Regions:
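Bacterial Sec-dependent N-terminal signal peptides
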Residues: 1, 7-52
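Active-site mouth of glycoside hydrolases
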Residues: 53-339, 344-386, 392-483
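Histidine-centered catalytic/metal-binding microenvironments
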Residues: 487
Length: 487
């Protein structure tokens, strides 16, 4: 109903009084709603998980524990979890809740989530929206999304590994911090045409991957850029969840803090390697000083992410504030099943009447996988660090991307990886890459505000994602998760 003009004519004094009263009333309502949110969170958590999930994950003698019970897990990557939990652009809380329910029902109790997303907007190969748009300037809707995600995880007795930074370009990462401190530099051209000068971080899909890697290798040499990254760590580790009222350092839904996604020094020289170890040491000690309750790890790919230097891998994972080691395995990206697939702008689908290398070469992928795991385990043996395979992925048959399309090769590979975790004792847990769930994929290459899947914006959507429609893969995951929990 519209009020008459006369009914809206009040004196300035009366208006001010009413505004003051309204502000007080709204403040009381806000506090009441926050208390109600907290109450219903605690009530639902107590109802669903009475007596469970009260401990932090710890490490003892190279194993994870929850209280006195060994903790082994099958998890997934859900880098977009905080964005999906937002009520702003890109957010969809209804979908997030449903995805978490699906994950729980499959037996997945661990998710690896990005708490970065940095720098300039408008780059097609970057995720959107960004969490940190300028140094210390944060998108509060995504922070709220992270709080919501952590609350929902705790309700389900699930745990998160949260990573702050990224060596790769798809979330900003190294390059964003260099841009913020005004770094400019020259790199060698990948086409042999000489040297190129860049005022901002090169975009790999436009300027070249070799150009990008040379440029961002300067991150670990740049004290100003690293200082900004440390400020981001302080911001996130000291955060209080707006829905539960709990400090993150006290959260049982948090398993570990992770320094970066696939941190690298990107150059195979002694200076870069030494500075890389120094940075991992500084960041891990900083995190531990702010939060002594939770585990800390690197986010490393393993030897492959350490310039193929196994001793560098060992050095960063035996630092005092690093609790466990991680490795990633990518048979497709690393050429273990052939080199046909390396140009993201090419049509890589395989004709129906042609042999499918994704299926035919899966044994080669399995052989290389166990060799990679064995090497990591051998170099860390006796150091008391569990190893987590926190990323692994495999394409769909014939390099298709659609949900529900054949996954014979992937299913064989997943089965093999899970069998290693179950039987060898060399891997304490894993997170497959990654969860696409119930996303409605509209484009092969991500367009702004398309549904998120686990394939970042620079990759084909569906390349490595596991969808809810992938029933044979989900059954393998479910059986493997259940088997680990029974051990």
């Amino acid at each position: 109903m519209r009020k008459s003009f006369a009914s809206l004519r009040y004196t300035a004094t009366h208006t001010a009084s009413m505004q003051t009263t309204l502000l007080k009333t709204n403040a009381m309502k806000s506090r009441t709603l926050r208390l109600a949110d907290t109450f219903f969170f605690l009530l639902s958590a107590a109802t669903l998980w009475a007596g469970e999930g009260k401990e932090f994950v710890t490490v003892k003698d190279g194993r994870f524990y929850l209280g006195e019970k060994e903790y082994r897990y099958v998890g997934t990557n859900l880098w977009y979890g905080a964005i999906l939990g937002s009520e702003g652009s890109g957010g969809n809380r209804q979908r997030l809740v449903r995805e978490l329910d699906d994950l729980y029902n499959v037996g997945i109790d661990n998710v690896r989530v990005l708490i970065g997303g940095d720098g300039r907007d408008g780059i097609p190969s970057h995720i959107a929206p960004k969490l940190q748009t300028a140094p210390g300037v944060y998108n509060d809707t995504i922070l709220a999304g992270l709080d919501f995600l952590m609350m929902e995880l705790e309700k389900r007795n699930m745990r998160a590994v949260l990573y702050f930074n990224n060596a790769w370009e798809w979330s900003g990462g190294y390059g964003a911090y260099l841009d913020w401190v005004g770094y400019k530099g020259e790199v060698e051209s990948s086409d042999g045409s000489g040297r190129k000068f860049f005022e901002l971080t090169p975009v790999p899909s436009i300027d070249g991957w070799w150009e990008y890697m040379q440029y961002v290798s300067n991150f670990i040499l740049n004290e100003q850029a690293k200082a900004l990254a440390a400020n981001h760590v302080r911001k996130m580790v000291t955060r209080r969840n707006r829905y539960t009222g709990e400090l993150y350092k006290d959260s049982k839904a948090l398993m570990a803090w992770e320094i970066a996604n696939e941190p690298r020094c990107f150059m195979n020289d002694s200076l870069h390697k030494a500075k890389f170890v120094e940075w991992i040491d500084e960041q891990s000690r900083l995190i531990k000083s702010l939060d002594p309750n939770h585990l800390v790890t690197t986010g490393s790919e393993g030897k492959h992410g350490c310039e193929d230097d196994i001793n560098l891998f060992k050095a960063i994972h035996t630092l005092p504030a690093i609790d466990y080691a991680c490795i990633h395995i990518w048979p497709n990206n690393w050429g273990w099943i052939g080199q046909f697939n390396q140009n993201y702008d090419a049509d890589k689908t395989i004709a129906e009447d042609a042999p499918d290398p994704i299926v035919e070469n899966v044994q080669a992928a399995c052989d290389s996988t166990i060799a990679y795991i064995n090497e990591a385990h051998k170099v860390l043996e006796g150091h008391g660090r569990p190893i987590v395979l926190e990323e692994f992925g495999y394409p769909r048959d014939r390099f298709l991307f659609d949900a529900g399309s054949p996954t014979k090769g992937r299913d064989i590979y997943y089965n093999y990886v899970f069998s290693i975790i179950s039987s060898s004792g060399k891997i304490a847990g894993c997170n497959f890459w990654g969860w696409g769930g119930r996303a409605n994929v509209k484009h092969t290459i991500w367009q702004r505000w398309d549904d998120y899947v686990c394939d970042p914006a620079q990759e084909e959507q569906g390349l490595n994602s596991v969808f809810y429609a992938d029933k044979s893969t989900l059954e393998i995951i479910k059986k493997s998760a259940q088997a680990l929990k029974k051990r």
